[in-house]
Amino acid sequence: DAANGAFIPVFKQMIQEFGGANVILCNTSLENGINHNCGVADLEGRHIVEANELSQEPLCHAEALIRILEEGRRKREQNSEGLTVGLVLDGDGDRCFMPVYDPQKDRIIIIDGDGLAILQLLWLKQNQKTREGQLYLNTVESSLEASRSALKAGCFVKQCAVGDKWILWDALLKAYKWKCNFFRNHINDPEFSRMLLNLENSFKNMEEQSSFD
């Protein structure tokens, strides 16, 4: 579910990389209105969607969930072992939920962004693509359970303020500090030292003012 928004072309490109999966792409028209009767908005705070809810407001317009229910039931009748899952974004693509069909109870389980992050983390760890002390960054609105799970997986958990710019800012600042220390230990030049000092002062001012130049 591209929420009739910014990720439409990205989703269309991703489909080519899904191998043998049967992919259904929906809500891909800007003319129908971004986030209108689609996307994650109506899924906020939900963990379970019962089948009968899809015939009532507001979820009766949720095309992605309806298609997941239909496909899940079809696979259940065929005794198929394949999973029926979805990816539901919001209009600008910075949030993603994963609805999963539960064939045992004929319902849809909603995995939110925090849950998805932990699933990705556990997959990376299982495939030895993480290291001890790996940074796990989330916001003050994130689930405490997600932070506990990340700590249990051996990550260093850091919280930041809400919003994309703060996550990017935190990543930028950490990268800058690492490079700064590296160059200090490898370059002995007065002019270069003055430049680093000016940069440090600029970063400090930006942090104090919560602004970006």
Model region roles, listed by residue range:
Residues A2-D213:
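Phosphate-binding chemistry for phosphorylated carbohydrates and sugar-nucleotides
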